[in-house]
Amino acid sequence: MVAVSGTQRTRTVSLARWAVYAGSVFAGAWLATQLFYLAQIALWLFVNPGSTAFMRTDAWWLSRDTPPAQIRHQWVPYDQISRNLKRALIASEDSTFATNNGYDVDAILQAWEKNKARGRIVAGGSTITQQLARNLFLSREKSYIRKGQELIITWMLETVLDKERIFEIYLNSVEWGRGVYGAEAAARYYYKIPASRLGAWQSARLAVMLPKPRWFDAHRGSAYQAQRAAVIARRMGAAELPQSE
């Protein structure tokens, strides 16, 4: 049997104490971050978000790369956004949005299998609420840690806000090209009209852009966009909007 010296025992105890201390600090910081997110979401019951994490990051890059350029963004109330666009986004991004709890388990499992096969994260299986969680608070980085945080924020959004409010914030904050955020800015940028006047075909084409808005902004009128828009347009009639609609 090997004897343990007093010095070794003291060092072991010190390391254990530091580990407990570091763990406590980390846990406290993590909890404070979650409470900050929750408080922000609760505030949005009464006021509209001024900006999102994506907007702030984009604004920084624009100011560095093209100083005169600014973020295009104008908040408009839910009832001033075309029903065509609402239906197009649900048909394209999250067909069960009106009834799900913010998660699509089948889509998440499919994304997991796809990522495992590729050996890296290439898909996320995100619902509209998950996309909103990411846009509001997180970054474009693809990692399992970020995905875990996204799922927690999604639960907060679904718990605190109703579906119409979630969709209203999403419609006003989603990216439609570099520096273009929200339905009103997108409608005016691409079609020179307010979001309230978007037709079915225009809405379907905007919906196609969401997975890769910057790519589609640079490749407007592509054959794929037209083909995909036709598919979305056919599905729009069956898209279920939040109940108050």
UniProtKB/Swiss-Prot annotation:
What gene codes for this chain?
mtgA
What does the entry list under GO cellular component?
peptidoglycan-based cell wall; plasma membrane
Q: What is this protein called?
A: Biosynthetic peptidoglycan transglycosylase
Protein family per UniProt: Belongs to the glycosyltransferase 51 family.
The protein's organism comes out as Burkholderia cenocepacia (strain HI2424)
Task: Specify whether Cell inner membrane is a keyword of the entry.
Answer: yes
Q: Name one GO molecular function term.
A: pentosyltransferase activity
SUPFAM superfamilies under this entry? Lysozyme-like (SSF53955)
* Main localisation: membrane
Q: Which domain of life does the protein's organism represent?
A: Bacteria
Q: Which UniProt keywords apply?
A: Cell inner membrane, Cell membrane, Cell shape, Cell wall biogenesis/degradation, Glycosyltransferase, Membrane, Peptidoglycan synthesis, Transferase, Transmembrane, Transmembrane helix
